[in-house]
């Protein structure tokens, strides 16, 4: 098991370790309460710099016209991506040890809420240079291991994957914590909130929820499911170990999910097959033209062409899998005259 001493280090021990933690679950599952307790414990026990970014605290004021207003799905997605861009600006400042610049294109209200979020957690402070506002990193942000905990529903796997991509881009640690709270409990808690969500919204999220699945998605291997908020304190050691493991094993930029690699291989193979097919067709066509002057040769080539067409699939099996020829044609003389033997082709 990793220890805090392995992670904390000093300035001479190399670059500071940084990570992103996705905290997901249904609305009113207890994520915000859990995140605050986790941040306090890690600051006290591990000496880390922790930034909790609660999406509900940063995003609503940017678009809410009324207490229960909600943006269209497409607008919501754009706002989430914009918030990830803000996080990237902060991470670039931390990694490069420089001031945090202001995005040229931003939703002003959401940007201000994001800045307030970081200031309140002692990660940045305001400064002015040459009459331009900028934000400087605090000593806490640059001198300690840093973990950003993103608190949101993240009910779609694709939402969490966007955070993973950000971790991969900057070689950060990445992990996921899923609070698996019963739907009935979430509905009861939601009903007690001043600005409660419609119950049907939570029911819909419950049906659409895609839980972390490390067996299916290799990039989700650093994931931990906490059965209910009541068990959060009992899982504290597991949570700490998960975060330590993530910091010690940052996502490599060159790594990608296995599905994408398989897709790339298929595309590559398809391109090779297409080019090979074009080459074979060109060779057959040219040979036919050259044989037209000789009737006997032309008749033989006509038969050969028919044979190639009839055994097209078998030829590709040889190219792809180096298999034995399984010809539908009984005329094996074609194999002999072409000097193709009924055995696996040499790979040399």
Curated annotation (Swiss-Prot):
Its EC number is 2.7.1.164. Signal peptide: none annotated. Its cofactor is Mg(2+). Pfam families: KTI12. Specifically phosphorylates seryl-tRNA(Sec) to O-phosphoseryl-tRNA(Sec), an activated intermediate for selenocysteine biosynthesis. This is L-seryl-tRNA(Sec) kinase. Pathway: Aminoacyl-tRNA biosynthesis; selenocysteinyl-tRNA(Sec) biosynthesis; selenocysteinyl-tRNA(Sec) from L-seryl-tRNA(Sec) (archaeal/eukaryal route): step 1/2. Keywords: ATP-binding, Kinase, Magnesium, Nucleotide-binding, Protein biosynthesis, Transferase. It is an enzyme of class 2 (transferase). InterPro entries: KTI12/PSTK (IPR013641), L-seryl-tRNA_Sec_kinase_euk (IPR020028), P-loop_NTPase (IPR027417), Ser-tRNA(Sec)_kinase (IPR052648). The gene is PSTK.
């Amino acid at each position: 098991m990793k220890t805090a001493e392995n992670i904390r280090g000093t300035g001479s021990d190399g670059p500071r370790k940084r990570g992103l933690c996705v905290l997901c679950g249904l609305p009113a599952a207890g994520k915000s309460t859990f995140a605050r307790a986790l941040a306090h414990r890690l600051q006290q026990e591990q000496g880390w710099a922790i930034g909790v970014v609660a999406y509900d605290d940063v995003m609503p004021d940017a678009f809410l016209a009324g207490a229960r207003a909600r943006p269209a799905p497409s607008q919501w997605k754009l706002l989430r991506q914009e918030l990830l861009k803000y996080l990237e600006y902060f991470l670039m400042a931390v990694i490069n040890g420089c001031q945090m610049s202001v995005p040229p294109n931003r939703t002003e209200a959401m940007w201000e809420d994001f800045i307030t979020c970081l200031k309140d957690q002692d990660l940045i402070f305001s400064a002015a240079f040459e009459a331009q506002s900028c934000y400087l990193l605090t000593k806490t942000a640059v001198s300690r291991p840093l973990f950003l905990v993103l608190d949101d529903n993240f009910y779609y796997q694709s939402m969490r994957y966007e955070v993973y991509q950000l971790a991969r881009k900057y070689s950060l640690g990445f992990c996921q914590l899923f609070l698996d709270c019963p739907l009935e409990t979430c509905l009861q808690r939601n009903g007690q909130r001043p600005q409660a969500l419609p119950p049907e919204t939570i029911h819909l999220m419950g049906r659409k929820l895609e839980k972390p699945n490390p067996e299916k998605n290799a990039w989700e291997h650093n994931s931990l499911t906490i059965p209910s908020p009541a068990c959060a304190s009992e899982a504290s050691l597991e949570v700490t170990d998960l975060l330590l493991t993530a910091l010690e094993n940052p996502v490599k930029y060159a790594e990608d999910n296995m599905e994408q690699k398989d897709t790339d291989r298929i595309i590559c193979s398809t391109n090779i097959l297409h080019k090979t097919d074009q080459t074979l067709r060109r060779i057959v066509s040219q040979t036919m033209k050259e044989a037209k002057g000789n009737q006997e040769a032309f008749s033989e080539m006509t038969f050969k062409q028919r044979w190639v067409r009839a055994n097209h699939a078998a030829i590709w099996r040889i190219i792809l899998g180096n298999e034995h020829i399984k010809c539908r044609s009984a005329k094996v003389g074609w194999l002999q005259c072409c000097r193709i033997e009924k055995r696996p082709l040499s790979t040399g």
